[in-house]
């Protein structure tokens, strides 16, 4: 006999609280400000290498400032141990080991991510963000490997993958060609 009474009592209180917390009729909706997103993706950077994650040997005050006003990821895992497949997976959401040709790219590799693939940059653009990539790219450029004219516009570049702006290195500083590409 007590259980139906308690259930009725709890339900009644829940309904009363919900009704009492109703928003006033004349409120104007507030426009939410879209946050800036800075996604830092670095090679050979471990969890314990930044001060904001507990590193003691290196001071990283600028990263600490960004971390203090943003989000710290504390349970993230790389999909691959090397740069090209890891970057591919992060930008496309696909496991690189499931796609042929996503191992470590040569400096003159053709673009591994194809323009018809949906990328993280496409996702951000679809909700109004302006997107940029700066630094080491290492996912290939141009239509085919070893056919790029590094002195001319590339036929297949980051603009085709959803990026509005880019200032990148084609691969790494220790591979040829060492080309800085700016759009």
Where do the language-model regions lie?
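Formylglycine-dependent sulfatase
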Residues: 2-8, 17-181
